[in-house]
Protein backbone atom coordinates (compact mmCIF):
# COMPACT_ATOMS: atom_id res chain seq x y z
CA UNK A 1 0.00 0.00 0.00
CA UNK A 2 1.41 3.33 -1.06
CA UNK A 3 -0.07 6.70 -0.53
CA UNK A 4 0.55 10.42 -0.44
CA UNK A 5 -0.73 12.35 2.55
CA UNK A 6 -0.03 15.99 1.55
CA UNK A 7 2.96 16.47 3.85
CA UNK A 8 1.10 14.76 6.70
CA UNK A 9 2.67 11.77 8.42
CA UNK A 10 1.02 8.43 7.76
CA UNK A 11 -1.48 7.23 10.37
CA UNK A 12 -0.14 3.69 10.29
CA UNK A 13 2.52 1.48 8.76
CA UNK A 14 2.40 -1.87 6.99
CA UNK A 15 4.95 -4.43 8.15
CA UNK A 16 5.81 -6.63 5.17
CA UNK A 17 7.14 -9.37 7.43
CA UNK A 18 9.52 -12.14 6.43
CA UNK A 19 7.62 -13.76 3.56
CA UNK A 20 4.44 -13.48 1.49
CA UNK A 21 3.94 -17.26 1.26
CA UNK A 22 1.02 -18.37 3.46
CA UNK A 23 2.56 -21.83 3.94
CA UNK A 24 5.85 -20.38 5.14
CA UNK A 25 4.00 -17.83 7.29
CA UNK A 26 2.17 -20.64 9.11
CA UNK A 27 5.42 -22.57 9.59
CA UNK A 28 7.13 -19.45 10.95
CA UNK A 29 4.17 -18.77 13.23
CA UNK A 30 4.44 -22.23 14.79
CA UNK A 31 8.22 -21.95 15.10
CA UNK A 32 8.22 -18.44 16.61
CA UNK A 33 5.36 -19.32 18.97
CA UNK A 34 7.29 -22.35 20.23
CA UNK A 35 10.46 -20.30 20.68
CA UNK A 36 8.53 -17.54 22.49
CA UNK A 37 6.90 -20.02 24.89
CA UNK A 38 10.31 -21.56 25.64
CA UNK A 39 11.70 -18.05 26.13
CA UNK A 40 8.95 -17.24 28.62
CA UNK A 41 9.41 -20.55 30.45
CA UNK A 42 13.20 -20.32 30.53
CA UNK A 43 13.51 -16.72 31.68
CA UNK A 44 10.62 -16.76 34.15
CA UNK A 45 11.95 -20.07 35.47
CA UNK A 46 15.42 -18.59 35.90
CA UNK A 47 14.03 -15.58 37.79
CA UNK A 48 11.91 -17.79 40.08
CA UNK A 49 14.73 -20.23 40.85
CA UNK A 50 17.07 -17.39 41.80
CA UNK A 51 14.39 -15.73 43.94
CA UNK A 52 13.35 -18.96 45.68
CA UNK A 53 16.83 -20.30 46.48
CA UNK A 54 18.71 -18.33 49.14
CA UNK A 55 22.08 -19.71 48.05
CA UNK A 56 21.69 -17.86 44.76
CA UNK A 57 21.14 -14.49 46.44
CA UNK A 58 24.55 -13.21 45.30
CA UNK A 59 25.55 -10.32 43.00
CA UNK A 60 26.18 -12.69 40.08
CA UNK A 61 22.65 -14.06 40.16
CA UNK A 62 21.19 -10.66 40.97
CA UNK A 63 22.50 -9.48 37.59
CA UNK A 64 21.37 -12.70 35.94
CA UNK A 65 17.83 -12.07 37.19
CA UNK A 66 17.79 -8.71 35.42
CA UNK A 67 19.29 -10.25 32.27
CA UNK A 68 16.41 -12.73 32.21
CA UNK A 69 13.92 -9.90 32.78
CA UNK A 70 15.39 -7.85 29.92
CA UNK A 71 15.45 -10.85 27.56
CA UNK A 72 11.85 -11.64 28.45
CA UNK A 73 10.79 -8.03 27.84
CA UNK A 74 12.96 -7.76 24.72
CA UNK A 75 11.25 -10.75 23.15
CA UNK A 76 7.79 -9.58 24.24
CA UNK A 77 8.25 -6.20 22.53
CA UNK A 78 8.70 -7.88 19.13
CA UNK A 79 7.43 -11.47 19.06
CA UNK A 80 3.67 -11.14 19.89
CA UNK A 81 3.19 -8.48 17.19
CA UNK A 82 5.20 -10.58 14.75
CA UNK A 83 2.98 -13.59 15.49
CA UNK A 84 -0.14 -11.47 14.96
CA UNK A 85 1.21 -10.19 11.65
CA UNK A 86 1.84 -13.73 10.44
CA UNK A 87 -1.81 -14.67 11.01
CA UNK A 88 -3.91 -11.53 10.67
CA UNK A 89 -3.38 -7.85 9.94
CA UNK A 90 0.13 -6.58 9.30
CA UNK A 91 -0.80 -2.98 10.15
CA UNK A 92 0.77 -1.12 13.06
CA UNK A 93 -0.17 2.41 14.11
CA UNK A 94 2.32 5.27 13.90
CA UNK A 95 2.31 5.55 17.70
CA UNK A 96 2.56 1.79 18.14
CA UNK A 97 5.48 1.61 15.74
CA UNK A 98 7.47 4.28 17.56
CA UNK A 99 6.56 2.76 20.94
CA UNK A 100 7.92 -0.59 19.76
CA UNK A 101 11.07 1.11 18.50
CA UNK A 102 11.51 2.96 21.82
CA UNK A 103 11.24 -0.13 24.03
CA UNK A 104 13.36 -2.19 21.65
CA UNK A 105 16.19 0.38 21.74
CA UNK A 106 15.75 0.91 25.50
CA UNK A 107 16.05 -2.79 26.34
CA UNK A 108 18.83 -3.40 23.82
CA UNK A 109 20.97 -0.59 25.24
CA UNK A 110 20.21 -1.67 28.81
CA UNK A 111 21.36 -5.22 28.00
CA UNK A 112 24.66 -3.94 26.59
CA UNK A 113 25.50 -2.10 29.80
CA UNK A 114 24.13 -4.92 31.97
CA UNK A 115 26.60 -7.30 30.31
CA UNK A 116 29.30 -4.78 31.27
CA UNK A 117 28.11 -4.86 34.88
CA UNK A 118 28.20 -8.65 34.83
CA UNK A 119 31.78 -8.55 33.49
CA UNK A 120 32.78 -6.26 36.38
CA UNK A 121 31.21 -8.75 38.80
CA UNK A 122 33.26 -11.61 37.29
CA UNK A 123 36.39 -9.42 37.49
CA UNK A 124 35.82 -8.80 41.20
CA UNK A 125 35.07 -12.49 41.89
CA UNK A 126 38.21 -13.81 40.18
CA UNK A 127 40.75 -11.01 40.64
CA UNK A 128 39.82 -10.12 44.25
CA UNK A 129 38.03 -13.17 45.71
CA UNK A 130 38.90 -12.33 49.33
CA UNK A 131 37.41 -8.84 49.01
CA UNK A 132 34.55 -9.79 46.69
CA UNK A 133 31.72 -9.22 49.16
CA UNK A 134 33.20 -5.84 50.15
CA UNK A 135 33.76 -4.70 46.55
CA UNK A 136 30.36 -5.87 45.31
CA UNK A 137 28.41 -4.08 48.01
CA UNK A 138 24.66 -3.65 47.84
CA UNK A 139 25.10 0.01 46.89
CA UNK A 140 27.46 -0.82 44.00
CA UNK A 141 25.17 -3.60 42.76
CA UNK A 142 22.22 -1.21 42.71
CA UNK A 143 24.30 1.38 40.84
CA UNK A 144 25.47 -1.22 38.31
CA UNK A 145 21.89 -2.33 37.69
CA UNK A 146 20.27 1.14 37.70
CA UNK A 147 22.83 2.63 35.31
CA UNK A 148 21.96 0.38 32.33
CA UNK A 149 18.25 1.19 32.62
CA UNK A 150 18.84 4.95 32.93
CA UNK A 151 21.30 5.08 30.02
CA UNK A 152 19.01 2.87 27.95
CA UNK A 153 16.06 5.18 28.57
CA UNK A 154 18.02 8.33 27.66
CA UNK A 155 19.55 6.84 24.51
CA UNK A 156 16.23 5.43 23.35
CA UNK A 157 14.38 8.68 24.07
CA UNK A 158 16.88 10.72 22.04
CA UNK A 159 16.71 8.15 19.23
CA UNK A 160 12.91 8.15 19.01
CA UNK A 161 12.61 11.95 19.29
CA UNK A 162 15.06 12.42 16.41
CA UNK A 163 13.20 9.82 14.32
CA UNK A 164 9.80 11.38 15.07
CA UNK A 165 10.92 14.66 13.48
CA UNK A 166 11.22 12.95 10.10
CA UNK A 167 8.31 13.00 7.65
CA UNK A 168 6.65 9.87 6.27
CA UNK A 169 4.04 10.73 3.65
CA UNK A 170 5.28 9.02 0.47
CA UNK A 171 5.08 5.43 1.68
CA UNK A 172 3.97 3.51 4.75
CA UNK A 173 5.37 0.10 3.79
CA UNK A 174 8.12 -1.14 6.15
CA UNK A 175 10.16 -3.92 4.58
CA UNK A 176 10.78 -5.63 7.89
CA UNK A 177 8.88 -7.66 10.49
CA UNK A 178 9.10 -5.02 13.24
CA UNK A 179 9.74 -1.28 13.60
CA UNK A 180 13.50 -0.86 13.51
CA UNK A 181 15.53 2.23 12.69
CA UNK A 182 17.08 1.22 9.34
CA UNK A 183 13.88 0.31 7.44
CA UNK A 184 12.02 3.29 8.91
CA UNK A 185 14.79 5.69 7.91
CA UNK A 186 14.46 4.31 4.39
CA UNK A 187 10.82 5.52 4.30
CA UNK A 188 11.54 9.12 5.25
CA UNK A 189 10.79 11.83 2.70
CA UNK A 190 13.18 14.26 4.39
CA UNK A 191 16.95 14.28 4.70
CA UNK A 192 18.01 11.68 7.25
CA UNK A 193 21.74 12.44 7.34
CA UNK A 194 21.77 14.17 10.75
CA UNK A 195 19.47 11.53 12.24
CA UNK A 196 21.66 8.73 10.89
CA UNK A 197 24.78 10.37 12.34
CA UNK A 198 23.08 10.80 15.73
CA UNK A 199 21.91 7.17 15.80
CA UNK A 200 25.33 5.97 14.69
CA UNK A 201 26.95 7.93 17.52
CA UNK A 202 24.47 6.59 20.09
CA UNK A 203 24.75 2.97 18.98
CA UNK A 204 28.49 3.21 18.36
CA UNK A 205 29.23 4.75 21.76
CA UNK A 206 27.05 2.16 23.50
CA UNK A 207 28.83 -0.72 21.81
CA UNK A 208 32.31 0.79 22.24
CA UNK A 209 31.93 1.73 25.92
CA UNK A 210 30.31 -1.55 26.92
CA UNK A 211 32.70 -3.67 24.85
CA UNK A 212 35.70 -1.76 26.21
CA UNK A 213 34.67 -2.33 29.83
CA UNK A 214 33.95 -6.01 29.12
CA UNK A 215 37.27 -6.46 27.30
CA UNK A 216 39.22 -4.66 30.03
CA UNK A 217 37.61 -6.84 32.70
CA UNK A 218 38.50 -10.02 30.85
CA UNK A 219 42.08 -8.93 30.19
CA UNK A 220 42.59 -8.65 33.96
CA UNK A 221 40.69 -11.92 34.48
CA UNK A 222 42.93 -13.70 31.95
CA UNK A 223 46.12 -12.46 33.63
CA UNK A 224 44.78 -13.60 37.00
CA UNK A 225 43.83 -17.06 35.69
CA UNK A 226 47.29 -17.51 34.12
CA UNK A 227 48.86 -16.88 37.53
CA UNK A 228 46.90 -19.75 39.10
CA UNK A 229 49.20 -22.74 39.53
CA UNK A 230 46.74 -25.63 39.66
CA UNK A 231 44.95 -26.83 36.53
CA UNK A 232 41.74 -27.42 38.46
CA UNK A 233 41.87 -23.86 39.78
CA UNK A 234 42.27 -22.47 36.27
CA UNK A 235 39.38 -24.59 35.00
CA UNK A 236 37.14 -23.50 37.88
CA UNK A 237 37.95 -19.82 37.33
CA UNK A 238 37.43 -20.08 33.59
CA UNK A 239 34.14 -21.98 33.98
CA UNK A 240 32.64 -19.04 35.87
CA UNK A 241 33.26 -16.79 32.85
CA UNK A 242 32.61 -19.00 29.83
CA UNK A 243 28.82 -18.60 29.91
CA UNK A 244 29.06 -14.82 30.07
CA UNK A 245 31.67 -14.74 27.30
CA UNK A 246 29.50 -16.89 25.05
CA UNK A 247 26.45 -14.70 25.67
CA UNK A 248 28.46 -11.53 24.98
CA UNK A 249 29.93 -12.93 21.75
CA UNK A 250 26.56 -13.95 20.31
CA UNK A 251 24.77 -10.74 21.33
CA UNK A 252 27.40 -8.24 20.19
CA UNK A 253 28.30 -9.95 16.92
CA UNK A 254 24.71 -9.68 15.66
CA UNK A 255 24.31 -6.08 16.88
CA UNK A 256 27.54 -4.92 15.23
CA UNK A 257 26.63 -6.70 11.99
CA UNK A 258 23.20 -5.06 11.93
CA UNK A 259 23.74 -1.51 13.18
CA UNK A 260 27.33 -0.34 12.74
CA UNK A 261 27.09 0.21 9.00
CA UNK A 262 25.66 2.91 6.70
CA UNK A 263 22.04 2.71 5.61
CA UNK A 264 23.09 2.14 1.97
CA UNK A 265 24.52 -1.26 2.92
CA UNK A 266 21.18 -2.35 4.39
CA UNK A 267 20.33 -5.78 2.94
CA UNK A 268 16.75 -6.93 3.39
CA UNK A 269 17.47 -10.66 3.56
CA UNK A 270 20.68 -10.55 5.62
CA UNK A 271 19.42 -7.98 8.09
CA UNK A 272 16.12 -9.78 8.62
CA UNK A 273 17.93 -13.03 9.44
CA UNK A 274 20.19 -11.17 11.89
CA UNK A 275 17.15 -9.41 13.40
CA UNK A 276 15.32 -12.71 13.91
CA UNK A 277 18.40 -14.03 15.66
CA UNK A 278 18.83 -11.22 18.20
CA UNK A 279 15.13 -10.47 18.80
CA UNK A 280 13.70 -14.00 18.93
CA UNK A 281 16.54 -16.54 19.20
CA UNK A 282 19.01 -14.92 21.65
CA UNK A 283 16.40 -14.42 24.43
CA UNK A 284 15.75 -18.18 24.39
CA UNK A 285 19.47 -19.03 24.31
CA UNK A 286 20.56 -17.03 27.37
CA UNK A 287 18.72 -19.16 29.98
CA UNK A 288 20.25 -22.26 28.37
CA UNK A 289 23.73 -20.72 28.23
CA UNK A 290 23.67 -19.62 31.87
CA UNK A 291 22.00 -22.73 33.32
CA UNK A 292 23.15 -25.82 31.40
CA UNK A 293 26.81 -25.33 32.37
CA UNK A 294 26.03 -24.00 35.84
CA UNK A 295 26.03 -26.58 38.63
CA UNK A 296 24.77 -24.01 41.16
CA UNK A 297 21.61 -23.41 39.12
CA UNK A 298 21.07 -27.14 38.62
CA UNK A 299 21.49 -27.78 42.35
CA UNK A 300 19.15 -24.88 43.12
CA UNK A 301 16.46 -26.43 40.91
CA UNK A 302 16.84 -29.72 42.80
CA UNK A 303 16.62 -27.95 46.17
CA UNK A 304 13.50 -26.01 45.17
CA UNK A 305 11.82 -29.16 43.86
CA UNK A 306 12.70 -31.07 47.03
CA UNK A 307 11.28 -28.31 49.22
CA UNK A 308 8.06 -28.38 47.23
CA UNK A 309 7.79 -32.14 47.69
CA UNK A 310 8.57 -31.92 51.42
CA UNK A 311 5.91 -29.24 51.92
CA UNK A 312 3.16 -31.47 50.55
From Swiss-Prot:
Matches recorded under Pfam families: 7tm_4
Extracellular side: 1-26, 77-99, 161-197, 259-271
Gene Ontology cellular component list: plasma membrane
First-listed, main subcellular location of the protein, grouped into a coarse class: membrane
Positions annotated with a glycan in the UniProt record: 6
UniProt record similarity statement: Belongs to the G-protein coupled receptor 1 family.
Name listed for the protein in its UniProt record: Olfactory receptor 8H2
Organism of derivation: Homo sapiens (Human)
Lineage, uppermost ranks: Eukaryota, Metazoa, Chordata, Craniata, Vertebrata
Gene: OR8H2
